[in-house]
Regions:
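Autoinhibitory propeptides
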Residues: 64-175, 185
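Extracellular S/T/G-rich loop segment that most often corresponds to the catalytic His/Ser-adjacent loop
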Residues: 323-432
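N-terminal domain-start motif of subtilase-like serine proteases
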Residues: 89, 153-197, 224-225, 344-353, ...
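Primarily auto-inhibitory N-terminal propeptides
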Residues: 2-64, 103
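Active-site alpha-helical elements of protease catalytic centers
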Residues: 200, 213, 222-257, 414-436
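Substrate-binding/access-modulating region of protease and related hydrolase catalytic domains
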Residues: 238, 254-328, 338, 408-425, ...
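Acidic-leg catalytic submotif of subtilisin-like serine proteases
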Residues: 179-225, 311, 364
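C-terminal subdomain of the subtilisin-like protease fold in secreted/lumenal serine endopeptidases
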Residues: 277-281, 410-414, 436-491
């Protein structure tokens, strides 16, 4: 295992149970021969490559690799567009792949700062932050079959955010739903009805907030043992609320991202034709622009298929990927103070990509709180979930108050939070408004056209990096629904 991890794990029965589970359930992706013959994984940083349809797995060869893996003793979890997701004992994986595997811990949820993610974890990891991967690289050639290309290990993704049906009372300023819609210039009567968002996140608790307000949230059941309505983290439930704030008439389908599995599985399910999804909202990513070939190809296919794909730019200095992919719409954060003055959020990330020359992140922004903890919106979450506990007074320190705690209880199902996670979900809701208006006008919007509408109509933020746009503070600025609709009418 990674240096220094042993003593930490030995003090926690919960962590040791997770270690025992990983010894028997290591998960990895095998990319198989593609239709074009190009390998998918080496293209993860490429500016250009073959048309995405040519990079999809050759069906016959994928089938042969699956049979070979089953014969070797592995479980086939998922046969997808670009390869196969496999699960099996760590010892078997190390033997078949001819590599040394190491137990590692991803940087995780801070107990002492910022709503969700930061780079270096000062305390014990959470169970879901443990993973197994090779010691030298997260990918290696697949030597067990002539029809397989590469083996890829994907660490758990980072989530950038962080029971009464009504928000709890607090003594500090919270931006309510009506104020969010005002700042985003949402016209009265626009609800996004008829639009469908595929929200890929941690789970979707049936909070009474949704039913009381008549919001249409449908957790999608993906197979035996799947429990999409269970949200131990609380993040997915909160993100759904942000979508409905802007587009109360939209439908949100929740695709649970099991952190034991590669993220492309949930994205494929969300993008399948039978899902009926128009917009795919992703408030997560990987820091330092760490890239994965199968995930990149999956996103390219979603965009090619006409889906709107949004990713959060990250919080607290994280340089997030896939947000830096030029194909996606990257969302950052703008803070509006009590006098309605707009400024870049000092909690939201922004950067010039080192992977894609000339790429500025974010493209546009939603609303986001400021450091130290991003407490700005009061969001529903699963009672007792990680998000519920994270901001509560008793979790931070008895007697602590805003801006260091949200003044809520650890199991009341509400959390003061924000981040580029929340901003991304808001923009997903705004995309629903524009898609509904496009249908009314008999027009079609794809990812490229929608990004152009959002950037052309955004409200520039004066304090951003000298005032020029786009910039690494707020991109083109804060999204504006009414202006975007005017732009749409002129297309």
């Amino acid at each position: 295992m990674a240096e220094g991890l042993g003593p930490i794990l030995s003090r926690s029965a919960r962590l040791m149970r997770r270690v025992q589970q990983l010894e028997q359930r290591v998960t990895f992706t095998v990319t198989t021969r593609t239709i074009s013959g190009e390998r998918v994984n080496p293209l993860r940083n490429a500016r250009e490559s073959a048309p995405i349809e040519r990079l999809m797995a050759h069906a016959d060869k994928r089938g042969k690799v699956a049979e070979r893996l089953k014969a070797l003793g592995f479980e086939i979890v998922h046969e997808g567009w670009f390869g196969i997701v496999v699960r099996g004992p760590a010892a078997l994986a190390a033997e078949v792949l001819r590599t040394k595997l190491m137990l590692q811990a991803r940087a995780g949820l801070s107990r002492i700062r910022s709503t969700q993610i930061f780079r270096h974890n000062p305390g014990a990891p959470l169970p879901e932050e443990l993973f197994v991967a090779p010691t030298q690289s997260l990918s290696l050639p697949a030597s067990f079959s002539e029809d397989a290309d590469d083996v890829i290990f994907e660490p758990p993704a980072l989530y950038f955010q962080p029971v009464s049906p009504s928000p709890v009372a607090c003594t500090y300023r919270i931006v309510d739903d009506a104020t969010v819609r005002r700042y985003l210039d949402v016209p009265v009567g626009q609800t996004g009805a008829g639009s469908v968002v595929g929200l890929v996140d941690t789970g979707f608790y049936p909070h009474p907030f949704f039913g009381t307000n008549g919001f249409d949230l449908e957790p999608i059941w993906a197979g035996p043992g799947d429990l999409p309505e269970v949200d131990e983290v609380g993040h997915g439930t909160a993100m759904a609320a942000n979508i409905f704030t802007v587009a109360p008439g939209a439908k949100v389908k929740g695709f649970k991202h099991d952190l034991d599995l590669p993220s492309h599985i949930a994205l494929e399910r969300a993008g399948a034709p039978e899902s009926g999804v128009d917009v795919i909202s992703c408030s997560w990513g990987f820091e330092d622009e760490q890239t994965f070939g199968v995930l990149r190809s999956t996103i390219r296919k979603l965009v090619s298929d006409g889906k709107i794909v949004l990713f959060a730019a990250g919080n607290a200095g994280v340089r997030a990927w896939p947000a830096s992919m030029p194909e996606v719409i990257a969302v950052g954060g703008v803070y509006a103070d009590e006098n309605d003055a707009l400024m870049p959020s000092d909690y939201a990330s922004g950067f010039a990509s080192s992977r894609y020359p000339g790429r500025i992140v974010p493209d546009i922004c939603g609303l986001c709180g400021n450091a130290p903890r991003g407490i700005y919106l009061m969001l529903p979450c699963a009672p007792g979930s990680r998000l519920d506990k994270l901001q509560a007074v008793t979790s931070v320190s008895p007697g602590m108050a805003f801006p260091d705690a949200d003044e809520t209880e650890e199991s009341d199902g509400w959390a003061g939070a924000s981040g580029t996670s929340a901003a991304t979900a808001q923009v997903a809701g705004l995309a629903c408004l524009l898609l509904a208006e496009a249908r009314r006008l008999g027009k079609t919007l794809d990812n490229v056209r929608l990004k152009a509408l959002l950037t052309a109509s955004a409200r520039a933020v004066p304090q951003s990096a000298g005032g020029a746009v786009p910039n690494t503070a707020t991109g083109f600025g804060l999204v504006q629904a009414a202006r975007a609709m005017d732009e749409l009418s002129r297309l």
